[in-house]
Amino acid sequence: SLPIIYGGNSYGGYLAHLIAKIAPWHCQAILDNSCSPLPQLEYLVGRELGQGDATTLDRDLNIKLYSKTFWTCDANSKYCFTSEHYKIRSLLNAEHLKIQAKYAKDTLFISYHSAYDEFGTAKDKEKLYELYRALGFKAKLHLIKDEKELDKKFIRSLKHSLGMSDSGLFRKELPFILEKFKGKNFTQRQGEISYPCGDKIFTFKDEGEKFLLEIS
């Protein structure tokens, strides 16, 4: 069967990496453009932090927009977003990456990122890909640092997302990925992986046609 490849831009790229973390046996390659390796709290508890998901300008007003979520900073709520919830969502966790490496050293990671990304995520992305390589992952980060690297077709700017389209990303890298996997057969299998987070253990596993999360 064909390899399973996940990819995306910004948050989509983050989700692709997250799938590789919680279900490494279900993916062979990750394609990313400009994802943050760390959870962005404004998308989870932004209203309580006074940080909107986005801001829109309406004449003389800056209007902050928020996602409606169950998460809260209230320590007495069952929906309190704790450090454990943060850790399991973080890609940049050395302890978790060591566990992931036991299941996914053959997974191919390819990422593009601007060194001048306005969200300040470039250093974290460099650290993540350095850890990937140190742990034996097949990982390549294209860190765009200079305007000379802008071809105005594939990479158009040094801002977040590089002016790059998802279709452009796949057109650029998919032939390379398929060539790397040429002659290999991939079979679907069920698996299970557990990550310690503080006093909790998050276990992700296949069970029949379902993919389950158990927290103990």
What are these regions (language model features)?
Residues L18-C80:
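Hydrolase active-site cap/lid region
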Residues Y79-Q100:
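Active-site nucleophile elbow and catalytic-triad environment of alpha/beta-hydrolase enzymes
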Residues Y11-G13, S36-P39, Y116-E118, K148-E149:
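Solvent-exposed loop/turn segments at secondary-structure junctions
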Residues Y6-G8, N33:
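Short beta-strand immediately N-terminal to the catalytic nucleophile in serine-hydrolase-like folds
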Residues K102-F109:
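Short, proline-enriched alpha-helix->beta-strand connector loops that line the catalytic pocket
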Residues S1-L2:
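Conserved acidic catalytic loop of the alpha/beta-hydrolase fold
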Residues G8-L18:
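Glycine-rich nucleophile elbow surrounding the catalytic serine of serine-hydrolase chemistry
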Residues Y112, Y116-S216:
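C-terminal catalytic histidine-bearing segment of alpha/beta-hydrolase fold enzymes
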